[in-house]
């Protein structure tokens, strides 16, 4: 019963709690144990469900024929560049917010729609911070490609979720089912902290990006080992 408990789906949690208490001869009226076990099993099943939702979004390729995808891309531009209109859909202007060429769709190949959704979420919920970081990214010596780095950090957040490293963080953030919102919030933390880290480290050039990205990755993994960790900008 206990071994199976960590694999239950959300609708089965209540029954599983009763079964465990019966198996271990724990009084059903012991509400403290019952509540804690219920929350723990919800968190475990919720983590798995969140990963599946994130993975499904990652698997959706950016489609320039999809109106919703295009609207999100234009929204990203408008959030970051409110005083400058796009002259065309295919334009070198996209490089101004850190895409590699004149059509951002090619930059989303690795992380699919998840990369765009993350970028839009940060720009929408932390607009001032996003514009400030975009400004930092244009630094003459320490500059980097804002959107490309943002998508790279989506991959970091995704891999940490996939390998289970985000469990303590998410269990501390929400006593129940973690939602996509909580993944986005962690992503926002990564973007904000990476920008600080990059300028503190002062790399010689963007050519050393992978080296410093890995150093930042190790720093985050170290923080996530703390069982009391909460890594959000709201915190």
List each language-model region with its residue ranges.
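Extended acidic/polar regulatory tracts at the flanks of large eukaryotic scaffold/adaptor proteins
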Residues: 1-235
